[in-house]
Design a protein with these regions (language model features):
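Charged/polar, solvent-exposed surface patches and flexible loops
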Residues: 2, 33, 99-100
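Cytosolic regulatory/linker segments at or just downstream of nucleotide-handling modules
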Residues: 54-56, 77, 83-130
Length: 130
């Protein structure tokens, strides 16, 4: 999991997340070309991106804690990542992220995800400027 906006504000968090996802997919594509040349199976990656308020900080006990992030936006991103296997897209995003860079995205579907009573509009990444 990766996140932006904590501990310091990050106004371009959505753009950074989209560019990072694009770079991840490009690196996996390069690695898969090498694996193909070796006759080895390819790797797949699924990326779910969502934006929203979260609780961020050190969580756990004094003897063992992690700096982590919790909240509905995180859970939704996880659900989106899980849905990538149902589409021919390695990256799926919620509207809360898409609103920041709609020109970089295309609509994929409206889906039901666990923990949500209403349908979630899902988008993927296209036309990204570096």
């Amino acid at each position: 999991m990766a996140f932006w906006g904590a501990p310091l504000d990050c106004e371009d968090h959505a753009e950074r997340a989209m560019l990072t996802a694009k770079d991840m997919v490009a690196l996996i594509d390069d690695l898969n070309a090498e694996l193909d040349a070796e006759g080895l199976p390819n790797l797949n990656v699924g990326v779910g991106i969502n934006s929203g308020p979260c609780v961020v900080g050190n969580m756990g006990s004094q003897s063992r804690f992690d700096y982590s992030v919790l909240g509905d936006a995180v859970n939704t991103a996880s659900r989106l990542e899980g849905q990538t296997r149902n589409y021919e897209e390695w990256i799926l995003m919620g509207e809360s992220t898409v609103q920041y860079k709609p020109e970089w995205t295309k609509y994929v579907d409206s889906i039901q995800v666990k923990g949500k009573s209403e349908l979630l509009s899902v988008y993927t990444l296209t036309n990204v400027a570096d």
